[in-house]
Protein backbone atom coordinates (compact mmCIF):
# COMPACT_ATOMS: atom_id res chain seq x y z
CA UNK A 1 0.00 0.00 0.00
CA UNK A 2 1.42 3.38 -1.03
CA UNK A 3 1.95 5.92 1.76
CA UNK A 4 -0.50 8.82 1.68
CA UNK A 5 1.11 12.02 0.41
CA UNK A 6 1.77 14.30 3.37
CA UNK A 7 3.30 17.77 3.22
CA UNK A 8 3.78 19.91 6.32
CA UNK A 9 2.57 23.33 5.27
CA UNK A 10 3.10 26.22 7.67
CA UNK A 11 1.25 29.16 6.15
CA UNK A 12 1.60 32.76 7.33
CA UNK A 13 0.88 35.05 4.36
CA UNK A 14 -2.74 33.90 4.35
CA UNK A 15 -3.14 35.21 7.89
CA UNK A 16 -2.66 38.78 6.65
CA UNK A 17 -5.74 40.91 5.92
CA UNK A 18 -7.82 39.85 2.92
CA UNK A 19 -6.71 42.99 1.04
CA UNK A 20 -3.42 41.20 0.32
CA UNK A 21 -4.75 38.28 -1.72
CA UNK A 22 -7.65 36.33 -3.12
CA UNK A 23 -8.12 32.83 -1.76
CA UNK A 24 -8.63 30.40 -4.61
CA UNK A 25 -7.54 27.06 -5.99
CA UNK A 26 -5.62 26.62 -9.23
CA UNK A 27 -7.57 25.59 -12.29
CA UNK A 28 -7.68 21.83 -12.74
CA UNK A 29 -5.54 20.84 -15.71
CA UNK A 30 -6.65 17.89 -17.86
CA UNK A 31 -3.56 15.68 -17.91
CA UNK A 32 -0.66 16.59 -15.63
CA UNK A 33 2.63 14.87 -16.44
CA UNK A 34 6.05 15.38 -14.90
CA UNK A 35 8.73 16.90 -17.13
CA UNK A 36 11.45 17.35 -14.52
CA UNK A 37 11.65 16.99 -10.74
CA UNK A 38 14.44 18.69 -8.80
CA UNK A 39 15.24 15.86 -6.40
CA UNK A 40 17.98 17.67 -4.50
CA UNK A 41 15.67 20.60 -3.80
CA UNK A 42 12.89 18.19 -2.78
CA UNK A 43 15.14 16.77 -0.11
CA UNK A 44 16.19 20.25 1.06
CA UNK A 45 12.50 20.99 1.61
CA UNK A 46 11.80 17.73 3.42
CA UNK A 47 9.75 16.37 0.52
CA UNK A 48 9.93 12.79 -0.75
CA UNK A 49 10.88 12.62 -4.46
CA UNK A 50 9.51 9.09 -4.86
CA UNK A 51 6.09 10.22 -3.63
CA UNK A 52 6.10 13.25 -5.91
CA UNK A 53 6.85 11.08 -8.95
CA UNK A 54 3.65 9.09 -8.34
CA UNK A 55 0.58 10.47 -10.11
CA UNK A 56 -0.87 11.62 -6.77
CA UNK A 57 2.33 13.59 -6.23
CA UNK A 58 2.26 15.03 -9.74
CA UNK A 59 -1.36 16.08 -9.19
CA UNK A 60 -0.29 17.74 -5.95
CA UNK A 61 2.54 19.61 -7.69
CA UNK A 62 0.15 20.77 -10.41
CA UNK A 63 -2.51 22.00 -7.98
CA UNK A 64 -5.03 19.27 -8.83
CA UNK A 65 -4.84 17.63 -5.39
CA UNK A 66 -5.21 20.28 -2.68
CA UNK A 67 -4.29 18.99 0.77
CA UNK A 68 -6.35 19.92 3.81
CA UNK A 69 -3.55 22.06 5.29
CA UNK A 70 -3.10 24.14 2.14
CA UNK A 71 -4.62 27.58 1.73
CA UNK A 72 -3.96 28.50 -1.92
CA UNK A 73 -4.13 32.16 -2.87
CA UNK A 74 -3.23 34.71 -5.52
CA UNK A 75 -1.27 37.73 -4.30
CA UNK A 76 -2.01 41.30 -5.27
CA UNK A 77 0.63 43.88 -6.14
CA UNK A 78 1.19 46.91 -8.35
CA UNK A 79 4.35 48.00 -10.12
CA UNK A 80 6.30 50.38 -12.29
CA UNK A 81 6.69 48.69 -15.67
CA UNK A 82 9.34 50.36 -17.83
CA UNK A 83 8.96 53.42 -15.61
CA UNK A 84 5.17 53.64 -15.89
CA UNK A 85 3.03 52.93 -12.84
CA UNK A 86 0.33 50.27 -13.06
CA UNK A 87 -1.86 50.45 -9.93
CA UNK A 88 -2.91 46.80 -9.97
CA UNK A 89 -1.07 43.78 -11.34
CA UNK A 90 -1.04 40.71 -9.11
CA UNK A 91 -0.64 36.99 -9.73
CA UNK A 92 -2.29 36.75 -13.12
CA UNK A 93 -1.18 33.18 -13.79
CA UNK A 94 0.26 32.08 -10.46
CA UNK A 95 -1.05 30.57 -7.24
CA UNK A 96 0.74 30.37 -3.90
CA UNK A 97 0.04 26.80 -2.76
CA UNK A 98 1.51 27.34 0.69
CA UNK A 99 4.67 27.70 2.76
CA UNK A 100 7.16 25.03 3.81
CA UNK A 101 9.86 24.97 6.45
CA UNK A 102 12.96 23.45 4.86
CA UNK A 103 15.60 21.24 6.42
CA UNK A 104 17.62 24.40 7.10
CA UNK A 105 14.77 25.83 9.19
CA UNK A 106 13.98 28.56 6.66
CA UNK A 107 10.52 29.29 5.30
CA UNK A 108 9.86 28.92 1.57
CA UNK A 109 6.89 29.66 -0.67
CA UNK A 110 5.60 26.91 -2.96
CA UNK A 111 4.07 28.64 -5.98
CA UNK A 112 2.66 27.50 -9.31
CA UNK A 113 3.20 29.50 -12.50
CA UNK A 114 0.87 28.81 -15.40
CA UNK A 115 -1.86 27.37 -13.20
CA UNK A 116 -4.83 29.20 -14.72
CA UNK A 117 -6.81 32.40 -14.51
CA UNK A 118 -7.10 34.52 -11.38
CA UNK A 119 -8.91 37.82 -10.71
CA UNK A 120 -5.59 39.48 -11.66
CA UNK A 121 -5.27 37.87 -15.10
CA UNK A 122 -6.64 40.92 -16.93
CA UNK A 123 -6.72 39.89 -20.62
CA UNK A 124 -4.46 36.86 -20.14
CA UNK A 125 -5.41 33.19 -20.11
CA UNK A 126 -3.46 32.38 -16.94
CA UNK A 127 -1.50 29.70 -18.74
CA UNK A 128 2.13 29.25 -19.63
CA UNK A 129 3.62 27.71 -22.71
CA UNK A 130 6.34 25.09 -22.42
CA UNK A 131 9.13 27.47 -23.47
CA UNK A 132 8.99 29.94 -20.56
CA UNK A 133 8.71 27.08 -18.06
CA UNK A 134 11.81 25.32 -19.38
CA UNK A 135 13.71 28.62 -19.59
CA UNK A 136 12.97 29.51 -15.97
CA UNK A 137 13.79 25.99 -14.78
CA UNK A 138 17.20 26.12 -16.47
CA UNK A 139 18.15 29.72 -15.69
CA UNK A 140 16.98 29.81 -12.07
CA UNK A 141 18.77 26.54 -11.29
CA UNK A 142 21.88 27.77 -13.09
CA UNK A 143 21.83 30.97 -11.04
CA UNK A 144 21.55 28.96 -7.84
CA UNK A 145 24.48 26.75 -8.82
CA UNK A 146 26.50 29.86 -9.68
CA UNK A 147 25.95 31.06 -6.11
CA UNK A 148 23.56 33.90 -6.93
CA UNK A 149 20.44 34.50 -4.77
CA UNK A 150 17.43 33.32 -6.74
CA UNK A 151 14.06 31.69 -6.68
CA UNK A 152 14.29 27.97 -7.48
CA UNK A 153 12.54 25.47 -9.71
CA UNK A 154 11.13 22.44 -7.89
CA UNK A 155 9.43 20.89 -10.91
CA UNK A 156 8.16 21.42 -14.44
CA UNK A 157 4.93 19.79 -15.60
CA UNK A 158 2.93 19.32 -18.77
CA UNK A 159 -0.71 20.37 -18.30
CA UNK A 160 -2.20 18.32 -21.14
CA UNK A 161 -3.47 21.50 -22.81
CA UNK A 162 -2.34 23.40 -25.88
CA UNK A 163 -1.96 27.13 -25.39
CA UNK A 164 -1.83 29.67 -28.18
CA UNK A 165 1.09 32.09 -28.30
CA UNK A 166 2.73 32.71 -31.70
CA UNK A 167 1.08 29.37 -32.48
CA UNK A 168 -0.23 26.43 -30.46
CA UNK A 169 2.34 25.02 -28.01
CA UNK A 170 2.15 22.55 -25.12
CA UNK A 171 0.91 24.05 -21.86
CA UNK A 172 3.15 23.75 -18.83
CA UNK A 173 3.43 24.68 -15.15
CA UNK A 174 6.53 25.66 -13.22
CA UNK A 175 6.60 24.82 -9.51
CA UNK A 176 8.63 27.64 -8.00
CA UNK A 177 10.27 27.92 -4.60
CA UNK A 178 11.07 31.33 -3.11
CA UNK A 179 11.97 32.87 0.23
CA UNK A 180 8.81 34.88 -0.44
CA UNK A 181 7.04 36.54 -3.35
CA UNK A 182 6.81 39.98 -1.74
CA UNK A 183 7.88 42.62 -4.21
CA UNK A 184 8.46 46.36 -4.18
CA UNK A 185 5.23 46.42 -6.17
CA UNK A 186 3.40 44.86 -3.21
CA UNK A 187 4.23 47.97 -1.16
CA UNK A 188 3.37 50.23 -4.09
CA UNK A 189 -0.11 48.73 -4.32
CA UNK A 190 -1.04 49.84 -0.81
CA UNK A 191 0.84 53.15 -1.02
CA UNK A 192 -1.10 54.12 -4.14
CA UNK A 193 -4.33 53.44 -2.26
CA UNK A 194 -3.16 55.46 0.76
CA UNK A 195 -3.51 52.41 3.03
CA UNK A 196 -0.81 53.17 5.58
CA UNK A 197 -2.03 50.52 8.02
CA UNK A 198 -1.57 47.86 5.34
CA UNK A 199 1.88 49.19 4.47
CA UNK A 200 2.80 48.87 8.14
CA UNK A 201 1.33 45.37 8.34
CA UNK A 202 3.29 44.35 5.25
CA UNK A 203 6.53 45.91 6.50
CA UNK A 204 6.19 44.15 9.85
CA UNK A 205 5.54 40.86 8.06
CA UNK A 206 8.65 41.28 5.90
CA UNK A 207 10.74 42.12 8.96
CA UNK A 208 9.45 39.09 10.87
CA UNK A 209 10.01 36.78 7.91
CA UNK A 210 13.27 38.06 6.43
CA UNK A 211 14.95 40.42 8.89
CA UNK A 212 13.91 39.36 12.42
CA UNK A 213 17.11 40.82 13.88
CA UNK A 214 15.68 44.34 13.46
CA UNK A 215 12.19 43.55 14.80
CA UNK A 216 12.69 45.44 18.07
CA UNK A 217 14.73 48.34 16.71
CA UNK A 218 13.27 51.81 17.14
CA UNK A 219 14.16 52.70 13.53
CA UNK A 220 13.22 49.29 12.12
CA UNK A 221 11.58 50.70 8.98
CA UNK A 222 14.71 52.63 8.06
CA UNK A 223 16.71 49.49 8.74
CA UNK A 224 14.31 47.48 6.59
CA UNK A 225 14.98 49.83 3.68
CA UNK A 226 18.72 49.60 4.30
CA UNK A 227 18.66 45.79 4.44
CA UNK A 228 16.88 45.61 1.09
CA UNK A 229 19.31 48.15 -0.41
CA UNK A 230 22.24 45.99 0.75
CA UNK A 231 20.66 42.83 -0.66
CA UNK A 232 19.96 44.39 -4.03
CA UNK A 233 23.39 46.02 -4.37
CA UNK A 234 24.93 42.59 -3.75
CA UNK A 235 22.51 40.86 -6.12
CA UNK A 236 23.04 43.17 -9.10
CA UNK A 237 26.83 42.93 -8.76
CA UNK A 238 26.51 39.14 -8.70
CA UNK A 239 24.35 39.18 -11.84
CA UNK A 240 26.93 41.24 -13.66
CA UNK A 241 29.77 39.02 -12.45
CA UNK A 242 28.44 36.25 -14.70
CA UNK A 243 27.17 38.47 -17.52
CA UNK A 244 23.49 38.11 -16.66
CA UNK A 245 20.89 40.53 -18.04
CA UNK A 246 17.50 40.29 -16.34
CA UNK A 247 15.64 42.10 -19.09
CA UNK A 248 12.52 43.22 -17.21
CA UNK A 249 13.56 44.93 -13.97
CA UNK A 250 10.15 46.34 -13.16
CA UNK A 251 9.37 47.04 -9.51
CA UNK A 252 7.05 44.04 -9.46
CA UNK A 253 10.10 41.92 -10.33
CA UNK A 254 12.27 43.04 -7.41
CA UNK A 255 11.89 41.10 -4.19
CA UNK A 256 12.25 42.25 -0.60
CA UNK A 257 14.17 39.04 0.13
CA UNK A 258 16.93 39.88 -2.34
CA UNK A 259 16.31 36.93 -4.66
CA UNK A 260 16.29 37.07 -8.45
CA UNK A 261 12.72 36.55 -9.65
CA UNK A 262 11.01 36.19 -13.05
CA UNK A 263 13.18 35.07 -15.95
CA UNK A 264 11.02 35.95 -18.96
CA UNK A 265 13.38 37.69 -21.41
CA UNK A 266 16.59 37.18 -19.42
CA UNK A 267 19.87 36.15 -21.03
CA UNK A 268 23.56 35.59 -20.39
CA UNK A 269 25.89 37.63 -22.57
CA UNK A 270 27.91 35.90 -25.25
CA UNK A 271 30.46 38.42 -26.54
CA UNK A 272 30.91 41.34 -24.16
CA UNK A 273 28.89 44.46 -24.84
CA UNK A 274 28.52 46.87 -21.93
CA UNK A 275 25.14 48.03 -23.27
CA UNK A 276 23.82 44.62 -24.30
CA UNK A 277 20.05 44.24 -24.25
CA UNK A 278 18.12 41.20 -25.48
CA UNK A 279 14.52 41.77 -24.41
CA UNK A 280 12.12 42.32 -27.30
CA UNK A 281 9.96 44.57 -25.13
CA UNK A 282 12.89 46.80 -24.08
CA UNK A 283 13.28 48.79 -27.27
CA UNK A 284 14.95 51.74 -25.50
CA UNK A 285 17.45 49.56 -23.62
CA UNK A 286 16.21 50.69 -20.21
CA UNK A 287 17.26 47.36 -18.70
CA UNK A 288 20.52 46.92 -20.63
CA UNK A 289 23.51 45.33 -18.90
CA UNK A 290 25.23 48.57 -17.86
CA UNK A 291 22.02 50.20 -16.61
CA UNK A 292 21.02 47.47 -14.16
CA UNK A 293 22.58 49.16 -11.09
CA UNK A 294 20.87 52.46 -11.94
CA UNK A 295 17.50 50.75 -12.37
CA UNK A 296 17.88 48.87 -9.10
CA UNK A 297 18.56 52.17 -7.35
CA UNK A 298 15.54 53.75 -9.06
CA UNK A 299 13.34 50.85 -7.96
CA UNK A 300 14.62 51.11 -4.40
CA UNK A 301 13.66 54.78 -4.42
CA UNK A 302 10.10 53.71 -5.20
CA UNK A 303 10.22 51.37 -2.19
CA UNK A 304 11.53 54.21 -0.01
CA UNK A 305 8.59 56.40 -1.06
CA UNK A 306 6.12 53.81 0.20
CA UNK A 307 7.88 53.60 3.58
CA UNK A 308 8.02 57.35 4.26
CA UNK A 309 4.93 57.40 6.54
CA UNK A 310 6.52 54.67 8.68
CA UNK A 311 9.98 56.24 8.83
CA UNK A 312 8.87 59.55 10.35
CA UNK A 313 5.56 61.37 10.82
CA UNK A 314 7.29 64.52 9.58
CA UNK A 315 7.56 64.00 5.82
CA UNK A 316 10.63 66.22 5.40
CA UNK A 317 12.49 64.26 8.06
CA UNK A 318 11.38 60.99 6.49
CA UNK A 319 12.60 62.08 3.05
CA UNK A 320 15.99 63.13 4.43
CA UNK A 321 16.43 59.80 6.19
CA UNK A 322 15.34 57.80 3.14
CA UNK A 323 17.68 59.77 0.88
CA UNK A 324 20.54 59.13 3.28
CA UNK A 325 19.81 55.40 3.15
CA UNK A 326 19.52 55.40 -0.64
CA UNK A 327 22.84 57.22 -0.97
CA UNK A 328 24.50 54.01 0.25
CA UNK A 329 23.46 51.99 -2.80
CA UNK A 330 26.12 53.22 -5.24
CA UNK A 331 29.10 52.72 -2.89
CA UNK A 332 27.73 49.33 -1.79
CA UNK A 333 27.30 48.18 -5.38
CA UNK A 334 30.65 49.60 -6.48
CA UNK A 335 32.48 47.93 -3.61
CA UNK A 336 30.99 44.52 -4.35
CA UNK A 337 31.38 44.90 -8.11
CA UNK A 338 35.05 45.79 -7.66
CA UNK A 339 35.54 42.84 -5.30
CA UNK A 340 33.97 40.23 -7.57
CA UNK A 341 35.64 41.59 -10.70
CA UNK A 342 38.97 41.58 -8.87
CA UNK A 343 38.35 37.95 -7.93
CA UNK A 344 37.65 37.18 -11.59
CA UNK A 345 41.22 38.34 -12.24
CA UNK A 346 42.65 36.33 -9.33
CA UNK A 347 42.89 39.35 -7.03
CA UNK A 348 41.17 38.47 -3.77
CA UNK A 349 41.36 41.93 -2.20
CA UNK A 350 41.43 44.49 -5.02
CA UNK A 351 42.74 47.97 -4.31
CA UNK A 352 41.81 51.24 -6.01
CA UNK A 353 44.47 50.88 -8.71
CA UNK A 354 42.94 47.53 -9.73
CA UNK A 355 39.82 49.33 -10.95
CA UNK A 356 41.80 50.61 -13.94
CA UNK A 357 43.02 47.09 -14.70
CA UNK A 358 39.41 45.88 -14.68
CA UNK A 359 38.14 48.79 -16.79
CA UNK A 360 40.93 48.41 -19.35
CA UNK A 361 40.15 44.72 -19.77
CA UNK A 362 36.45 45.41 -20.29
CA UNK A 363 37.30 48.02 -22.94
CA UNK A 364 39.48 45.48 -24.76
CA UNK A 365 36.69 42.91 -24.54
CA UNK A 366 34.19 45.44 -25.89
CA UNK A 367 36.29 46.44 -28.90
CA UNK A 368 37.49 42.87 -29.47
CA UNK A 369 34.04 41.25 -29.16
CA UNK A 370 35.46 38.54 -26.93
CA UNK A 371 33.20 36.04 -25.23
CA UNK A 372 32.48 37.19 -21.67
CA UNK A 373 32.52 33.77 -20.01
CA UNK A 374 35.47 32.27 -21.89
CA UNK A 375 37.67 35.37 -21.57
CA UNK A 376 37.67 35.05 -17.79
CA UNK A 377 37.68 31.25 -17.63
CA UNK A 378 40.89 31.02 -19.67
CA UNK A 379 42.90 33.11 -17.20
CA UNK A 380 43.65 30.02 -15.11
CA UNK A 381 45.03 28.23 -18.19
CA UNK A 382 47.34 31.16 -18.90
CA UNK A 383 48.82 30.76 -15.42
CA UNK A 384 49.18 26.97 -15.52
CA UNK A 385 50.36 26.62 -19.13
CA UNK A 386 52.14 29.95 -19.69
CA UNK A 387 50.42 30.10 -23.08
CA UNK A 388 48.43 33.19 -24.10
CA UNK A 389 47.40 31.97 -27.55
CA UNK A 390 43.96 30.54 -26.76
CA UNK A 391 43.05 33.65 -24.78
CA UNK A 392 44.23 36.03 -27.50
CA UNK A 393 42.27 34.11 -30.13
CA UNK A 394 39.03 34.96 -28.32
CA UNK A 395 39.42 38.53 -29.63
CA UNK A 396 38.60 39.61 -33.19
CA UNK A 397 42.09 41.07 -33.52
CA UNK A 398 44.40 38.84 -31.45
CA UNK A 399 47.42 40.72 -32.78
CA UNK A 400 46.29 43.94 -31.05
CA UNK A 401 49.38 44.98 -29.02
CA UNK A 402 47.15 46.36 -26.26
CA UNK A 403 46.17 42.81 -25.35
CA UNK A 404 49.75 41.80 -24.58
CA UNK A 405 50.32 45.07 -22.72
CA UNK A 406 47.30 44.32 -20.55
CA UNK A 407 48.42 40.73 -19.92
CA UNK A 408 51.82 41.97 -18.81
CA UNK A 409 50.22 44.40 -16.34
CA UNK A 410 47.93 41.65 -15.03
CA UNK A 411 50.77 39.17 -14.50
CA UNK A 412 52.82 41.83 -12.75
CA UNK A 413 49.90 42.50 -10.38
CA UNK A 414 49.54 38.80 -9.59
CA UNK A 415 53.22 38.58 -8.63
CA UNK A 416 52.46 40.88 -5.69
CA UNK A 417 49.98 38.34 -4.27
CA UNK A 418 51.68 36.04 -1.73
CA UNK A 419 50.25 32.72 -2.95
CA UNK A 420 51.31 30.31 -5.68
CA UNK A 421 50.22 30.53 -9.30
CA UNK A 422 48.51 27.18 -8.84
CA UNK A 423 46.41 28.50 -5.97
CA UNK A 424 45.52 31.65 -7.92
CA UNK A 425 44.45 29.44 -10.84
CA UNK A 426 42.29 27.38 -8.50
CA UNK A 427 40.70 30.57 -7.14
CA UNK A 428 40.06 31.79 -10.68
CA UNK A 429 38.23 28.60 -11.60
CA UNK A 430 36.05 28.88 -8.51
CA UNK A 431 34.69 32.29 -9.54
CA UNK A 432 34.79 32.15 -13.36
CA UNK A 433 32.26 29.59 -14.58
CA UNK A 434 33.21 26.90 -17.06
CA UNK A 435 29.57 26.60 -18.03
CA UNK A 436 26.62 28.95 -18.40
CA UNK A 437 23.29 28.21 -20.10
CA UNK A 438 23.86 29.78 -23.50
CA UNK A 439 20.91 31.57 -25.09
CA UNK A 440 21.08 29.63 -28.35
CA UNK A 441 21.25 26.32 -26.47
CA UNK A 442 18.21 27.22 -24.37
CA UNK A 443 16.30 28.12 -27.53
CA UNK A 444 17.35 24.84 -29.14
CA UNK A 445 16.20 22.90 -26.07
CA UNK A 446 12.83 24.65 -26.18
CA UNK A 447 12.24 24.10 -29.89
CA UNK A 448 13.15 20.41 -29.56
CA UNK A 449 10.97 20.01 -26.46
CA UNK A 450 7.98 21.50 -28.27
CA UNK A 451 8.51 18.81 -30.92
CA UNK A 452 8.54 16.16 -28.17
CA UNK A 453 12.28 15.65 -27.63
CA UNK A 454 13.43 16.54 -24.09
CA UNK A 455 16.85 14.88 -24.29
CA UNK A 456 18.86 18.07 -24.79
CA UNK A 457 16.90 19.84 -22.04
CA UNK A 458 17.67 16.94 -19.67
CA UNK A 459 21.36 17.15 -20.55
CA UNK A 460 21.41 20.92 -20.03
CA UNK A 461 19.63 20.55 -16.68
CA UNK A 462 22.42 18.19 -15.63
CA UNK A 463 25.22 20.42 -16.93
CA UNK A 464 24.13 23.52 -15.01
CA UNK A 465 24.45 21.76 -11.63
CA UNK A 466 28.25 22.18 -11.49
CA UNK A 467 29.07 25.32 -13.49
CA UNK A 468 32.62 25.78 -12.16
CA UNK A 469 33.76 22.22 -12.91
CA UNK A 470 35.07 21.05 -16.28
CA UNK A 471 32.92 18.34 -17.82
CA UNK A 472 34.06 17.51 -21.37
CA UNK A 473 30.83 15.58 -21.98
CA UNK A 474 28.98 18.93 -21.93
CA UNK A 475 31.33 20.76 -24.30
CA UNK A 476 28.74 20.77 -27.08
CA UNK A 477 26.47 22.82 -24.79
CA UNK A 478 29.05 25.40 -23.69
CA UNK A 479 30.40 26.65 -27.01
CA UNK A 480 29.60 30.25 -27.98
CA UNK A 481 27.14 30.54 -30.85
CA UNK A 482 28.19 30.61 -34.48
CA UNK A 483 27.03 33.73 -36.32
CA UNK A 484 23.87 32.01 -37.55
CA UNK A 485 23.07 30.78 -34.01
CA UNK A 486 23.28 34.12 -32.19
CA UNK A 487 20.13 35.01 -30.26
CA UNK A 488 19.54 38.72 -30.76
CA UNK A 489 16.17 38.99 -28.99
CA UNK A 490 14.51 37.19 -26.12
CA UNK A 491 10.80 37.15 -25.33
CA UNK A 492 8.65 37.02 -22.21
CA UNK A 493 6.50 34.27 -23.66
CA UNK A 494 3.47 35.27 -21.58
Name each model-derived stretch.
Residues 3-4, 10-11, 17-20, 81-84, ...:
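Short secondary-structure boundary micro-motifs
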Residues 12-17, 108-118, 203, 207, ...:
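Active-site-adjacent bridging/hinge elements
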Residues 1-77, 283-494:
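Regulatory N- and C-terminal appendages and interdomain linkers associated
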Residues 252:
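Conserved protein-kinase catalytic-loop position immediately C-terminal to the HRD catalytic Asp
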Residues 31-34, 39-57, 62-216, 256-259, ...:
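Conserved ATP-binding subdomain of kinase catalytic cores across diverse folds
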Residues 25-26, 125-127, 222-223:
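Short, contiguous strand/loop micro-motifs
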Residues 133, 163-246, 256-363:
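ATP-dependent phospho-/nucleotidyl transfer catalytic cores
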Amino acid sequence: MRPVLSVDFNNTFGSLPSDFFVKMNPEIMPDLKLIKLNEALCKDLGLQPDQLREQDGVNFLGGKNILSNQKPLAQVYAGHQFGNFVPQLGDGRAILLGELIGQDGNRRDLQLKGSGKTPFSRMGDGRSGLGPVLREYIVSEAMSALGIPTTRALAALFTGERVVREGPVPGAILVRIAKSHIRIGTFEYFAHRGEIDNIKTLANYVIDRHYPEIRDKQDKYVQLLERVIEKQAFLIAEWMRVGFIHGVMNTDNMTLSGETIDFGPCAFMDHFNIDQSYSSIDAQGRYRFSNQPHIANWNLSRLAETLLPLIDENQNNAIKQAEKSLDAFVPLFTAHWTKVMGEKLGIEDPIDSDKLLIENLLELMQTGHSDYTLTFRKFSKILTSNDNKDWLNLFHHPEDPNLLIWLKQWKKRLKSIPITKEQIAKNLDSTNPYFIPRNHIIELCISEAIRGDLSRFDKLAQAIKTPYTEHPEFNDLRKPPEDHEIVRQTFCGT
